[in-house]
């Protein structure tokens, strides 16, 4: 009897742990993408970047409650050759622009030259979703 109870409790705790681990997991069809500018666009600064998302939601950083499990907020990665560590909060610097208010567009002041842009969705604590929602990297030229 005790062995069955321990086994049952272990299974329940494992199921709850798996459910919590998946709480911030977007569905497999979810994606983030840059609407504009287009890849290889020639633009002037400030650059208007419009972002889209399918299969998941957008919410401001720090959102609490159930909504935080079904949404995140955008981060624009600028001129990065490598993605940030997916197990740590997304850095906050000139190459990692946080859209804390849940914005889906932003004006970026970029110097003339070639630049790369990519999106990474973060949760309420600025950590990437698991699995991470990352857009394709685009390249633009600022005149």
Regions found by a protein language model. Give the residues of each.
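Residue-level detector of alpha-helix boundary/anchor positions
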Residues: 10-13, 27
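Serine/threonine-biased, Pro/acidic-interspersed low-complexity stretches characteristic
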Residues: 21-31, 130, 134-137
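Long, low-complexity serine/threonine/glycine- and acidic-rich segments characteristic of extracellular
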Residues: 40, 46-54, 58, 64-143
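Bacterial N-terminal signal peptides that target proteins for export
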Residues: 1-9
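Alpha-helical transmembrane segments and their juxtamembrane interfaces
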Residues: 13-14, 46
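Short, compositionally biased P/S/T/A/G/V-rich stretches that sit at domain boundaries
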Residues: 24-44
């Amino acid at each position: 009897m005790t062995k069955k109870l321990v086994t049952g409790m272990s299974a329940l705790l494992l199921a709850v742990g798996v459910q919590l681990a998946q709480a911030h997991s977007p569905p497999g069809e979810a994606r983030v993408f840059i609407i504009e500018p287009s890849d290889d666009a020639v633009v002037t600064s400030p650059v208007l970047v419009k972002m889209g998302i399918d299969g998941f939601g957008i919410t401001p950083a720090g959102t609490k409650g159930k909504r935080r499990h079904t949404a995140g907020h955008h981060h624009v990665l600028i001129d990065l050759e490598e993605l940030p560590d997916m197990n740590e909060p997304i850095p906050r610097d000139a190459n990692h622009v946080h859209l804390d208010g849940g914005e889906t567009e932003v004006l970026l002041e970029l110097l003339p030259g070639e630049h790369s842009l990519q999106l990474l969705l973060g949760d309420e604590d600025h950590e990437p979703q698991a699995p991470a929602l990352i857009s394709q990297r685009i390249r633009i030229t600022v005149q």
